[in-house]
Amino acid sequence: MTDKRKDGDHSKLLYCSFCGKSQHEVRKLIAGPSVYICDECVDLCNDIIREEIRDIGGARPHMTELPTPHKIRAHLDDYVIGQDLAKKVLAVAVYNHYKRLRSGSSADGVELGKSNILLIGPTGSGKTLLAETLARLLDVPFTMADATTLTEAGYVGEDVENIIQKLLQKCDYDVEKAQRGIVYIDEIDKISRKSDNPSITRDVSGEGVQQALLKLIEGTIAAVPPQGGRKHPQQEFLQVDTSKILFICGGAFAGLDKVVEQRTAQGAGIGFNAEVKSKDKKVTLSESFAKVEPEDLVKYGLIPEFIGRLPVVATLTELDENALIQILVEPKNALTKQYQALFKLEGAELEFREDALRAIAHKAMERKTGARGLRSIVEGVLLDTMYDLPSVENVSKVVVDEHVINGETQPIMIYDNPEKQAASAD
């Protein structure tokens, strides 16, 4: 196929018929009847064909009917327990965002502004789940980023532009589809400024990241390398308009309640005539978060320009024990339903008794992990049973009660064969 002789006979040197590169400049040269093509041109042709197929056959109208805020809220109710105010705020913000993308500008030339979202709520309150559920409902690309891994360009860590690269990967580098996507940036509170005062040292993972995110969130043309990097000199960077992408930032904001309390505490002034600030009333975390103002976020460590790019603020409440029990059983993809489906594949029914559900919720409350800690508790309790079940025959039912959750006993196995059940009990 190629001539590897090094006898100085240049007439035998083979070249790609498309890009003109010699056999020594490419990894592979494929021969046809008096024609040759290199591996780089093959890759380029594949990319062109994929794009044409997507444009002709794969193109379908996206979101032919934009769900109303009521429908968005109803869909969120199916998967997320509680957080009614946050759901309403999100439903309106998301509806307005995609309405803006469809309308462009109104007849009188008024350009609609972009409304990105800031979610404030304790760990395990449902911030990530809300964002994921919205993306599924709207059938748009969705990606998550961890703000703690981001640094300014030129420093060790992840550049903010990598967020757009991840979004493109989720939709097979379809720029149009990516520009309708949703990006969720978690742990946004971790990039707060280290202090209120400007520092002489560069804060590359705090204020520096906030500065880097400003343009991306507000709207800019981000240049992203094509799929697999720049394999071919003719390949250009993909241009992505981030003004059409909805950014949702979320964080637990530990300590923000103290900042709010300092601002809202009764009384002010100094001296004999000053009112004493009252601390008699115990204010919950949820009540404090409900009173958050932009000035509190500035004092916490977010720069004013960054807060300005996140005009829609939704606060999530702490989940109590009853809410955690609801999360275990009520959503369409509830945790107990998932494990019951898993056991059903082994031909066994899984039953969680009421006292078991309360014990799981109580344990999660003690760990202060919210809904996020529920899976690890259930997984730990059912580990031995899931290990043994595939090797045991005639098991028709597995029962989990409070004693199992507390580690006092193993889950009860009920067999089709009563004699075997009696033997296991002995």
From Swiss-Prot:
GO terms of molecular function: ATP binding; ATP hydrolysis activity; ATP-dependent protein folding chaperone; protein dimerization activity; unfolded protein binding; zinc ion binding
Record-linked Gene3D superfamilies: 1.10.8.60, ClpX chaperone, C4-type zinc finger domain, P-loop containing nucleotide triphosphate hydrolases
Any single Pfam family the record assigns to this protein: ClpB_D2-small
UniProt-listed GO biological process terms: cell division; proteolysis involved in protein catabolic process
Sites where the protein binds ATP: 122-129
Domain ClpX-type ZB positions: 4-57
UniProt: Zn(2+) binding residues: 16, 19, 38, 41
This protein's UniProt keywords: ATP-binding, Chaperone, Metal-binding, Nucleotide-binding, Zinc
A GO CC term assigned to this protein in UniProt: HslUV protease complex
Assembly description: Component of the ClpX-ClpP complex. Forms a hexameric ring that, in the presence of ATP, binds to fourteen ClpP subunits assembled into a disk-like structure with a central cavity, resembling the structure of eukaryotic proteasomes.
PANTHER family (UniProt xref): ATP-DEPENDENT CLP PROTEASE ATP-BINDING SUBUNIT CLPX-LIKE, MITOCHONDRIAL, ATP-DEPENDENT CLP PROTEASE ATP-BINDING SUBUNIT CLPX-LIKE, MITOCHONDRIAL-RELATED
Family statement drawn from the similarity comment of this UniProt entry: Belongs to the ClpX chaperone family.
Annotated function: ATP-dependent specificity component of the Clp protease. It directs the protease to specific substrates. Can perform chaperone functions in the absence of ClpP.
Name of the protein in its database record: ATP-dependent Clp protease ATP-binding subunit ClpX
Species of origin: Tolumonas auensis (strain DSM 9187 / NBRC 110442 / TA 4)
Gene: clpX
